[in-house]
Amino acid sequence: MRSAALILMLIVPLGQIAHAGGAACVMAKYQGQTLDYALVYGQSHPDEAQEAALAELRRKGYADHGRHLDLMRAQNLSNLDRAYVIVIRSEFRDRRGKARSAMGCGFSEDSYRDAELDAVRDLQAYFWGWKPDLHGYELVRRFQY
């Protein structure tokens, strides 16, 4: 009886892991500018969503590393089955006066407001000099999956 309960406790979490959702927001960047993004959701795991988003950016022509692209980077991943999603963009000048652009993606299972806060945090995590109250941002995309 005791071993049956232990087996059941192990099976339930594995079943929850197997049914996790997957979403990824990947950015194409060049010399301090965010050129484009790809947002993929509905995959079985965030890694699969990330690979699909990278492939989408490659199809758009962002695979030419060295000449026209610094990198493609997954900025935010989610394992939520359902989520509120916000994508933001900011164009601003850094402390040296250089024009910059940056984007952030946010996910939340609770609300658009929480997804927006996650998008702001995401943008700050990848561009430390960006301040939302100083530089501002615009809403690019807002939806649920």
Which role fits each region the language model picked out?
Residues 5-15:
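Bacterial N-terminal signal peptides
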Residues 19-145:
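Secreted/extracellular ectodomain signature
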